[in-house]
Amino acid sequence: MIHHLFVLDFVMIIILQKRKRQNCMKAKILFRVLLTIICIARVYSLISWMDSNSYIFRRFSGSFLVLMLAIPFLFSSCNSRNTKEEMQRITVKSSSDRIVSEWLDSIKVDVWAIHTDVPVAPIQSMDVIGNKCFVLDVFKRIFLIDIEKRLVLKSDITLGNARNEMLSPICLTADEEHVYVYDGMKECIFVLSYDLKLCQIVNTGCFFSTFRKIDNGFACLSMGSEQNFLFLRDDGVPVYSKQLSDKYPDEMQDGNPIQIGMDGYPYVKAYYSDTVFKWNGQELVESVQFDYGMGEPGGDYQKGSQLAHSGIAYTESYFLTNTHVLSSFVETDGRTIHYNLYDKENGVSCSGKMAPIDNVYFRATLQHGKEAYAVVLADEACVYGLKDIDMNNIVIIRYTFPS
């Protein structure tokens, strides 16, 4: 019986290692179940052993009991993760010089110009999963773009007040199976298949401006008189919230406030804020703070338009890799956008202008792990350095980070 328990110990070690590498929820549940089974089995084996070795048990019962029950808990404690991580404070110094970095030069750029028969209006929300790009434009139309096949498919879901109709879709996200479209008026999430057919409607009972699909739920940024992070379960029930900023952004920024870092964790930053938080699966913790040497904006700057003309620099977008933090920020003039690159290994940052990469400017808005994306309409192509783009084309740019 006892040697069977050591086999279970070995299996538990494997599960612990998987949990440590991936923060896998299934591995956590399996670990807890297995730990319970091992403890019950050890008690049963002790009772059986006590019957056959009554003299030895009377002499060493305390030691054996502690040893047999302590082994699984020792494995657990030795492999447990420390959820408290030290926040990285990045000092950003204003500069008009060009950033020189081998890491930036190693970013790979892919560009696809795809013809569309249905003109796409300015983009309100987008997401990219593999070779599928999903776009919601300001006319409330939803498009699926198959990057490999260069095919554009428009959703046939009509707007209306019927139960299966969207009234006011304001943002979307996707995973490997579905597209999730949030209706702000109905406060519910429409779950669509990859061919844009309705599968399910999830009621949330709360309002948010943008969201991302993550493990076991949704990471959301809610805005009213303040900005709050919300975590919703897959069934739409909010189970966690945290205030990120007391400032209401009446002007939105180009950068997506919620990114998926290269480590697989979701990160969130309020609009016009310089602090990036990390969602570790249980709570939101401070991860990165950009310091422009001016302190936090005062309470008088309650709106984005006021902050933009206040002479205070602020962070616009951010991208997190294993070795670097790349961010863009608005200079004190309220117009000029520069970049800052922070090297995690040596703790050095440099800021300034960013040279084109393969003749394409870096202006990504969305990060998915190792890749960042931008979806560009023809009239915006020149901002990215793209030329000869047909007016009936929609352009998808993928930036692949080296590490």
Model-derived regions, located:
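Beta-strand-rich domains and repeat architectures in extracellular enzymes and scaffolds
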Residues: V111-F139
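A short helix->beta-strand "capping" segment at the edge of beta-propeller domains
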Residues: S94-V120
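Conserved blade-ending motifs and adjacent loop-strand segments that build the rim/top face
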Residues: Q289-A308, E345-G369
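Repeated scaffold domains used in trafficking and secretory/extracellular systems
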Residues: P122-S125, M166-C171, C206-K213, D250-I258, ...
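C-terminal motif of bacterial Sec signal peptides marking the signal peptidase cleavage site
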Residues: F75-S77
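Short coil/turn segments at the loop-to-beta-strand junctions that recur within blades
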Residues: V118-V120, I157-N164, N203-S209, L244-D250, ...
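Blade-loop segments of beta-propeller domains
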Residues: L151-E176
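Short beta-strand elements that form the blades of beta-propeller/WD-repeat-like
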Residues: K132-D137, E177-D183, N216-M223, G261-A270, ...
